[in-house]
Every structure is written in structure tokens, then in C-alpha cells.
């Protein structure tokens, strides 16, 4: 792996000196190997090691290099035609491949090649971008989008219209991460590398970026870029120091309890093989 990452890192630094037409075969092969690893889940842009999230920046660079090395080409889907650099993940898949993967894909859901969906993932009509990792038992509900290189944990529910931010444009240092057993309410947006820690529940219409104040009403503490584990978060406002106006904030109203779990529990019937 160190050799592969070294080739990618050096190619990224030197990318102004070659084009898709004259790219050295070693670089093209390394980029393809990295994208294939992201696609089958053996590689991921970020992973939790000893309780801390570690970002493998070289894989993000491999994704960016893949756009440089691949030309746009027509992509067919029944009567629809597209023109893009990245193939769709499930193009040409057989019934046996779908059964082996254990993924349910509801039309017209789209996942790009280079994204990974683990067993018992359900993709309602939604979009999963390149580099994203969606772990076991998660549902990506209708019109939800999982951005480039985003990391979605096990048994997560991304409700209708949810947006999970990517890293490619605008260029972000770290991917957005939703940890295991989280519930993200309809039309909420989690972006800019924010981490929603395990077991948290985000209400409808909550918008969280790196500059969003995340206020814990029980302790008075303000967090940035991280929702603490087991939090229940709703949209709200905090007053200015002079009391003349208020600005948007995400408010931690309580910790997840049995009542919250009952309202946000996952339906195993929807994930049965």
C-alpha cells in the first residue's frame, strides 16, 4: 500500500506536467487500482483507528487524478444518455452480483463507480458520489445525496432530501462523517467535514458546517465541527452579545433516550434479503 500511495502522492504533485494522453502507465495503473479499491470497499478515504478518524489524503488525490486522466464519454441508461468521466457503479451488473453484494437499488438511484455500499444498504432514488463509503444496514432515502468521499456508518438513516457534503468542490480537507446508528432528519445538510458522532439524532431541517455553532442547552457548551455522541439536535438561534439580533445555531436539546429511539428506530423488514 505504501508504494501505491507514494505513486499517487508524487503524481498529484506533478500533475501539471502530464495530460491524459501522455500520462505514464504507472500513474494510470495506480489511480485505477485506488479507484477499484474504493469501489469494492477494501480502501476508504477515512477510517477510525484507535478511536480517532484518520483521513487518507492520498485516496482523495487519487479521485481528483481520475478526473484528469479520464475523458468524458457517452453513458447509456435505457432511453437516457449522459456524458461524464465516471461510470455508474452498477452498470452491467447481473442479478448474481446484486445478490452477492446484498445491496438494494431502487430506480432511479445512482451511485458512481468508486463508491462503496455494504451489505443490506438500501438506495432509494438517491445519489452517492465517488469515494463515498456507505456501511451495512444504512438507508439512503429519496433524493438524499452522499457527497464525494463522505463516510456513512452502520445502521444510519439518511432521510428524504438530506445532503451530506463532499470534498471535491469546494475543496475540503476532510470528509463529512456520519458515525454508526445515527438518524439524519429530512432536508438536513451536514457539510464541510463535520463529524456526527455515534447514535446522534439530527432533526428535520438542521444545517451544520464548520462555522455552525452547536449549542448544548444543558451545559452551555458550544461545539464546532462535531456533534457529540448520542445528541438530539434541532434547528434554533442564539442571541448576539448586544441582544439586537440572533443567528442560526444547531441546538442539542437532550441526549438520546428510549422515546427518541422509538421514534427513529430502523425497520428490519426493509433490509431483509
From Swiss-Prot:
<keyword id="KW-0012">Acyltransferase</keyword>
<dbReference type="GO" id="GO:0008666">
    <property type="term" value="F:2,3,4,5-tetrahydropyridine-2,6-dicarboxylate N-succinyltransferase activity"/>
</dbReference>
<comment type="pathway">
    <text>Amino-acid biosynthesis; L-lysine biosynthesis via DAP pathway; LL-2,6-diaminopimelate from (S)-tetrahydrodipicolinate (succinylase route): step 1/3.</text>
</comment>
<dbReference type="InterPro" id="IPR037133">
    <property type="entry name" value="THP_succinylTrfase_N_sf"/>
</dbReference>
<dbReference type="InterPro" id="IPR005664">
    <property type="entry name" value="DapD_Trfase_Hexpep_rpt_fam"/>
</dbReference>
<dbReference type="Pfam" id="PF14805">
    <property type="entry name" value="THDPS_N_2"/>
</dbReference>
<keyword id="KW-0808">Transferase</keyword>
<keyword id="KW-0963">Cytoplasm</keyword>
<dbReference type="InterPro" id="IPR001451">
    <property type="entry name" value="Hexapep"/>
</dbReference>
<dbReference type="GO" id="GO:0005737">
    <property type="term" value="C:cytoplasm"/>
</dbReference>
<comment type="similarity">
    <text>Belongs to the transferase hexapeptide repeat family.</text>
</comment>
<keyword id="KW-0457">Lysine biosynthesis</keyword>
<dbReference type="GO" id="GO:0016779">
    <property type="term" value="F:nucleotidyltransferase activity"/>
</dbReference>
<keyword id="KW-0028">Amino-acid biosynthesis</keyword>
<dbReference type="InterPro" id="IPR018357">
    <property type="entry name" value="Hexapep_transf_CS"/>
</dbReference>
<keyword id="KW-0220">Diaminopimelate biosynthesis</keyword>
<dbReference type="GO" id="GO:0019877">
    <property type="term" value="P:diaminopimelate biosynthetic process"/>
</dbReference>
<dbReference type="InterPro" id="IPR011004">
    <property type="entry name" value="Trimer_LpxA-like_sf"/>
</dbReference>
<dbReference type="GO" id="GO:0009089">
    <property type="term" value="P:lysine biosynthetic process via diaminopimelate"/>
</dbReference>
<keyword id="KW-0677">Repeat</keyword>
<protein>
    <recommendedName>
        <fullName>2,3,4,5-tetrahydropyridine-2,6-dicarboxylate N-succinyltransferase</fullName>
        <ecNumber>2.3.1.117</ecNumber>
    </recommendedName>
</protein>
<dbReference type="InterPro" id="IPR023180">
    <property type="entry name" value="THP_succinylTrfase_dom1"/>
</dbReference>
<dbReference type="Pfam" id="PF14602">
    <property type="entry name" value="Hexapep_2"/>
</dbReference>
Amino acid at each position: 500500500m505504501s508504494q501505491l500511495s507514494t505513486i499517487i502522492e508524487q503524481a498529484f504533485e506533478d500533475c501539471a506536467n502530464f495530460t491524459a494522453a501522455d500520462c505514464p502507465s504507472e500513474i494510470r495503473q495506480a489511480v485505477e487500482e485506488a479507484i477499484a479499491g474504493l469501489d469494492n470497499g477494501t480502501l476508504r478515504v477515512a477510517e477510525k483507528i484507535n478511536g480517532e478518524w484518520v483521513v487518507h489524503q492520498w485516496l482523495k488525490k487519487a479521485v481528483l487524478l481520475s478526473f484528469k486522466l479520464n475523458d468524458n464519454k457517452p453513458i447509456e441508461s435505457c432511453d437516457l444518455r449522459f456524458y461524464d468521466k465516471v461510470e455508474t457503479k452498477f452498470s452491467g451488473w447481473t442479478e448474481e452480483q446484486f445478490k452477492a453484494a446484498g445491496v438494494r437499488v431502487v430506480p432511479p438511484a445512482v451511485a458512481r463507480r468508486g463508491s462503496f455500499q455494504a451489505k443490506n444498504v438500501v438506495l432509494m432514488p438517491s445519489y452517492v458520489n465517488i469515494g463515498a463509503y456507505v456501511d451495512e444496514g444504512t438507508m439512503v432515502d429519496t433524493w438524499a445525496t452522499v457527497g464525494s468521499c463522505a463516510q456513512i456508518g452502520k445502521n444510519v438513516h439518511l432521510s428524504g432530501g438530506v445532503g451530506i457534503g463532499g470534498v471535491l468542490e469546494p475543496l475540503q480537507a476532510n470528509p463529512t462523517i456520519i458515525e454508526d446508528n445515527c438518524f439524519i432528519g429530512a432536508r438536513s445538510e451536514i457539510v464541510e467535514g463535520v463529524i456526527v458522532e455515534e447514535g446522534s439524532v439530527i432533526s428535520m431541517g438542521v444545517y451544520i458546517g464548520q462555522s455552525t455553532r452547536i449549542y448544548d442547552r444543558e451545559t452551555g457548551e458550544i461545539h464546532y465541527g462535531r456533534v457529540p455522541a448520542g445528541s438530539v439536535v434541532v434547528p434554533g438561534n442564539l442571541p448576539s452579545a448586544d441582544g439586537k439580533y440572533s443567528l442560526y445555531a444547531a441546538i442539542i436539546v437532550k441526549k438520546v433516550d428510549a422515546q427518541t429511539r422509538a421514534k427513529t428506530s430502523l425497520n428490519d423488514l426493509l433490509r431483509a434479503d
